[in-house]
């Protein structure tokens, strides 16, 4: 219920922002100015994008329902906020510096809402759908780029495809609406790329005339419900600077420079220090001297007297090892060395998340295994008919006893993959990872270790780019 309440509150805040956007007056030239029917072509083109691929994405998300639909509503809010910014840019000149950041803040906040939703729903059966959206929603930030935003959107689209490919693999022969959902979602970003190329090739096209867009409050000119109290009145002016102090400092500096300008003759005023005047030669001087005086402390602004508030203890998530539908969830296990899953079926998958210093054995034949955000994990399994994926992890060791067609390593530092004799034809697919090693069994029962290449060389051969592994001589 608490999660549902949080979701409702987030949606209410987003709706409030949109309502405020639609009511802001023209004289403020604010973020939410609604253009007239005669909107500039690039606003009309964005409306077309909302009415076609975005509408289809919302329709398919509603058919799937659940977390996918909730996520889509958040994405839709972000796109409508972006549309409001485009309408403002078509009527106003670009503000400078912090003022522009204020205009972009609602979009940035909505992007973070979308990402946070995925993080809070890692146990969702639609986790791959949520991840595809979460990894690519930052494409809405193209409006903040000063040059060539199109390639940035393409990069975000490619990030989404890493997860949409999983959705296709899981649902292609099971439920066609998930395939249509993937097609609709990716088309948003491909059409946005074409839109940017046509209207905003070198960045968001602001109006050359009209007033400068002012600081975005996202609120009507009058007070609104939920607005904070007025700011406190300014404090008293600072006391006048003492002129005598300034003259004293000036005189001191003049005297100092006069001494420096003496050059080597300044040493003539120095007095010889005999041994009986040195504390390390005459211990009696130490007893006579008082406490050592420290030099003047550098100036620091006075700090307000506030009582330190204790930091809230980090909430530790409960450890899980359970079968939820067709998914084995192994989460938040720490310092456990005897975890075993032995009642497996071919259609089941395993999702291993945030396990630290833990060993897990999966017996029997299973569809796929995903290792996400784990450290010092040891995984032993018999047979996997699909893929074993290691993501966002560190120091992971996996060993196949039977057969596996593919092992994918992504954003991982330190991964050892021990293959069996029956899995020597396994494909190792890696990206953004380091310290990867594949261990091949020998006749004597030992393993030979082979590092996976991490450094490459790319050349243009006149027609295409050719990439080869770079051999580094030891």
UniProtKB/Swiss-Prot annotation:
It is found in: Cell membrane. The modification N6-acetyllysine is found at residue 80. Directly regulates filament dynamics and has been implicated in a number of complex developmental and morphological processes, including mRNA localization and the establishment of cell polarity. Residues 215-253, 277-316 are annotated as: Disordered. One of its GO terms (cellular component) is glutamatergic synapse. Pfam families: CAP_C (PF08603), CAP_N (PF21938), CAP_N-CM (PF01213). Its main location: membrane. GO terms for molecular function: actin binding. There is a cross-link at residue 347 (Glycyl lysine isopeptide (Lys-Gly) (interchain with G-Cter in SUMO1)). It is a peripheral membrane protein. Keywords: Acetylation, Actin-binding, Cell membrane, Isopeptide bond, Membrane, Methylation, Phosphoprotein, Ubl conjugation. The modification N-acetylalanine is found at residue 2. This is Adenylyl cyclase-associated protein 1. Homodimer. Binds actin monomers. The modification Phosphoserine is found at residues 34, 289, 294, 300, 307, 309. InterPro entries: Adenylate_cyclase-assoc_CAP, Adenylate_cyclase-assoc_CAP_C, Adenylate_cyclase-assoc_CAP_N, C-CAP_CF_C-like, CAP/MinC_C, CAP_C_sf, CAP_CS_C, CAP_CS_N. The modification Phosphothreonine is found at residue 306. Belongs to the CAP family.
């Amino acid at each position: 219920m608490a999660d549902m309440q949080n979701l409702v509150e987030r949606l209410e805040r987003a709706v409030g922002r949109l309502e405020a956007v639609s009511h802001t007056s023209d004289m403020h030239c604010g973020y939410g100015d609604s253009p007239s029917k005669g909107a500039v072509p690039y606003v009309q083109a964005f409306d077309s994008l909302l009415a076609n691929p975005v509408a289809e994405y919302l329709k398919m998300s509603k058919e799937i329902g659940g977390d996918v639909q909730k996520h889509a509503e958040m994405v839709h809010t972000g796109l409508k906020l972006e549309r409001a910014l485009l309408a403002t840019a078509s009527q106003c000149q670009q503000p400078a510096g912090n003022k522009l950041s204020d205009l972009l803040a609602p979009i940035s906040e909505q992007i973070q809402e979308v990402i946070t939703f995925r993080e809070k729903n890692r146990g969702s059966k639609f986790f791959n759908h949520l991840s595809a959206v979460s990894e690519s929603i930052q494409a809405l930030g193209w409006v903040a780029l000063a040059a060539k935003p199109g390639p940035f959107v393409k990069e975000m689209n490619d990030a989404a495809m890493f997860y949409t490919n999983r959705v296709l693999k899981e649902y292609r022969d099971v439920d066609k609406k998930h395939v249509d959902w993937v097609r609709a979602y990716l088309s948003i970003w491909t059409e946005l790329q074409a839109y940017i190329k046509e209207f905003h090739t070198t960045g968001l096209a602001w109006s050359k005339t009209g007033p400068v867009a002012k600081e975005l409050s996202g609120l009507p000119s009058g007070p609104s419900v939920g607005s904070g109290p007025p700011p406190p009145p300014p404090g008293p002016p600072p006391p006048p600077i003492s002129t005598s102090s300034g003259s004293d400092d000036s005189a001191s500096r003049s005297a100092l420079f006069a001494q420096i300008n003496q050059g080597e003759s300044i040493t003539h005023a120095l007095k010889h220090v005999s041994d009986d005047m040195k504390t390390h030669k005459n211990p009696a001087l130490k007893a006579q001297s008082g406490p050592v005086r420290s030099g003047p402390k550098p100036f620091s602004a006075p700090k307000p007297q506030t009582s330190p508030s204790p930091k809230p203890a980090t909430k530790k998530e409960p450890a899980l090892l359970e079968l939820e539908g067709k998914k084995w969830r192994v989460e938040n296990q720490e310092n456990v060395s005897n975890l075993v899953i032995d009642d497996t079926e071919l259609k089941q998958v395993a999702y291993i998340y945030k396990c630290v210093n833990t060993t897990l054995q999966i017996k029997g034949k299973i569809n796929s295994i995903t290792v996400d955000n784990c450290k010092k994990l040891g995984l032993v399994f018999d047979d996997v008919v699909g893929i074993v994926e290691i993501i966002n992890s560190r120091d992971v060791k996996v060993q196949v006893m039977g057969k596996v067609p593919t092992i994918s390593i992504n954003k991982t530092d330190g991964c050892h993959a021990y293959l069996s004799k029956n899995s020597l034809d396994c494909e190792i697919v890696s990206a953004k990872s380091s310290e990867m090693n594949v261990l091949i069994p020998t006749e004597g029962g030992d393993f030979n270790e082979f590092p996976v290449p991490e450094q490459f060389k790319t050349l243009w051969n006149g027609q295409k780019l050719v990439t080869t592994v770079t051999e580094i001589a030891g």
